[in-house]
Amino acid sequence: MEAPAATSPSIGFPIDGRCNYFVEKKKRFCRMVAAAGKRFCGEHAGSAEEENTRKRILCPLDPKHTVYEDQLAKHLKKCNSREKPKPDFFIQDINAGLKDETEIPEQLVPFSSLSEEQLENLIKKLRKASEGLNSTHEDHIMSHPALHDALNDPRNGDCAVKHLKQQASILGNIEKLKLLGPRRCFVEFGAGKGKLSHWVDIALKDAENVHFILVERVTTRFKVDGKHRKKDSVFERLQIDIQHLCLNRVPVLREGRLPVVGIGKHLCGVATDVALRCLVETYAASFEEKDEEPLAKRIKNDKTEKESNTLAKEGSEKDVPETWTPVAGIVIALCCHHRCDWRHYVGKEYFKALGLGAVEFYYFQRMSSWATCGMRTSLEGSDVTPERKDAQRDENEEHDDGGDRLTDGNTDSLPGILTVEEKKKIGHLCKLLIDQGRLQYLQQKGFSPALQYYTDPLVSLENVLLTAVPAHPSSQEKHHQ
């Protein structure tokens, strides 16, 4: 292991009781506690002369840290990276799509190796499949009073304001759909720090019996959900991949029978598809097994229903209206279509009906990144302020653009030459087609879905919001495509 770095004169001395190892990259001493009588912490003890008789090795569970070789067995029993018992709501691949390997050739031609003719054929298929689709969405750029103070706080920089504007618009759209209210459970997919749920909770004020389930597959620092102390709001964080989440086994939903509102801000690619399946297929199926009518059948048999979104009342079964549905609504900001996957995609039937399959989907998802590639180039060449450009860089860092982004300087890497504007239009068509499959899926499941722009592209290049509510006759007029 690397020997302890020499102490920099400007750094001073290590804190008493702390490790004496100087971290060159951070220009400071390690802040870990050293054992009594030792100069270094366990991680850096191998560098010290007094500890060189004991060998440290990489932990086999997580090579990001080391452990004494003679204490490996003991360490493996308590290592934070050890596999933990699966919770009751974990069911392997319950929200995954059907695996059909026969539809995808073993070796697809890399996108960069496509001939000019192959690329032209793909673009022709894309344009034919997109005929009749509305290539632009309605503007639903909104805000909400709950974020007024934060949006006008001078201490918030451009990056923070950018995210606050998006959260405010999502919150405004949730309210417009009449999904803000008491006695329900908000499930935030890809929750991260939980800030979207945080603002929903603030907007609800003193609403009774509100639960929040925050789903995130990785450990997250600086979470905000742990700071809430309202007696009528309960926050629960589930560290699990959405692909394996069985919502009807989560205790609060199993026992409380609260209607669910699925929300998410920038739910990347495949995560959107497994989240939709988690909500409208896996979760709804648990109620159908209890001899409750499927949503689509209830809508067909109830043409006179005027209430678009009735809340489940707390109490006995007799208090629950006949039109109660497990999923009250869905509001998800989409992004990263290049991270979609044919196996998990919910719009397979839509693609097949258009004569398209896994191969076309494979290439369309990669070309979808051109939508924001073209916009980024035009922004860089415009009079956009440096602050706005920094915000765009931050957005690109938050959501990886994938390996198929093309800038203006390397258009010749494609078979034939496509201008930035042409790539941008093609990318948008790819996104539109993928999203259209999701809309059809939701319609078939008894929902009235829609796509809308929820924020300005200068705030976020990924500015499309997917919303859906149960398609009762009265809601179909208000929530059209």
From Swiss-Prot:
GO molecular function: tRNA 2'-O-methyltransferase activity; zinc ion binding
UniProt keyword annotation of DNA-binding present: no
Coiled coil: 113-140
EC number from the UniProt entry: 2.1.1.225
Compositional bias ranges of the Basic and acidic residues kind: 385-407
Residues the entry annotates as binding Zn(2+): 59, 65, 75, 79
UniProt KW keywords: Coiled coil, Metal-binding, Methyltransferase, S-adenosyl-L-methionine, Transferase, tRNA processing, Zinc, Zinc-finger
CHHC U11-48K-type ZnF: 56-83
Pfam families: TRM13 (PF05206), zf-TRM13_CCCH (PF11722), zf-U11-48K (PF05253)
Reactions catalysed, as given in the entry: cytidine(4) in tRNA(Pro) + S-adenosyl-L-methionine = 2'-O-methylcytidine(4) in tRNA(Pro) + S-adenosyl-L-homocysteine + H(+); cytidine(4) in tRNA(Gly)(GCC) + S-adenosyl-L-methionine = 2'-O-methylcytidine(4) in tRNA(Gly)(GCC) + S-adenosyl-L-homocysteine + H(+); adenosine(4) in tRNA(His) + S-adenosyl-L-methionine = 2'-O-methyladenosine(4) in tRNA(His) + S-adenosyl-L-homocysteine + H(+)
Role, per record: tRNA methylase which 2'-O-methylates cytidine(4) in tRNA(Pro) and tRNA(Gly)(GCC), and adenosine(4) in tRNA(His).
Family of this protein: Belongs to the methyltransferase TRM13 family.
Protein name per its UniProtKB record: tRNA:m(4)X modification enzyme TRM13 homolog
Taxon lineage: Eukaryota, Metazoa, Chordata, Craniata, Vertebrata
